[in-house]
């Protein structure tokens, strides 16, 4: 077998392969022998069909089967011998496949880029340091109390944290518009559900009042006919309710688990959960900075075939999240996922090189610690640990996460890392 490799464009390669006629002829003869033993033709016993009838009836399909076997086998023999790291599936083009002649074909395929890491010392990472305060825990307790709140009707004016029931009719230039009318609409004030100015226009009014609110729809509003338009809403304020928070008693805290018997227990449990969430958020924030730095310092081309595979993965994930079926998934435009898919492939290649160049292997003790951390969020942590330890697929997933964390650590060891004091809210609610 002779081999000729050429670069067509970017990461695309074309390999011209010649398979000697002796190998082709032998493969055809052996396939005919197998067929002769198994084919059934009326009028002949199995295994006794004459060769010329087999040729007439099955010759073309037998040769196609031989071709289907020879192409990938000799292609992969060739790329393995040349140590070519292929991406995706090759496409074959037959140049010669005739009796008594060499089989000549070409395979077009993509390769993964050769990655040589550089500029790690130029990567800048800001590593937040955070201390969870008693005030942070107080805020979390307030959230829990609001989740358990009741509502009491009020004759006072509307305040920012009230709940109101209203009728409204919206109009633009004196004309009502579609979707701008509602009856007995319940609105939780302060949540920003309505367009700017709507909630603000209700604050300070009393139940039973009728009044107008002047607002302007945002330029990016979803309805084309309302973008940037000035509108008037006629409001009838039917009911105002104040939020009544439950008292912070032992009876209240008992709702949050069998081990939570006092306010002190609740605060301890909240701190533990906040610490776990904070740890994950900090790891994620640092990792994203490392990824951004790696990509910036090491721009690489990625195989289109690998990007397409990742696009399909993202499509399927989107379908699962939103309850779509396979047909709907296929209709989602690739442009929605292309940038993220490309980035994922880049990150995978760069991390693979970090792992390879640093000769990293998953730290089993670190994997056990990660499982213990996951298990601590459950009421029966020992059962969770045992479940993971007996499931090889889950264990491998954990090892992969650990290996990725070790790769991040390897980059951080060479990067420019600075620490910045931050608050819990700044890390957990960066958009707030």
Swiss-Prot record:
GO biological process annotation, one example: protein transport
Subcellular location: Cytoplasm
Gene Ontology molecular function, alphabetical: peptidyl-prolyl cis-trans isomerase activity; protein folding chaperone; ribosome binding
PROSITE patterns the record matches: FKBP_PPIASE
Keyword Isomerase found: yes
Protein name: Trigger factor
E.C. code: 5.2.1.8
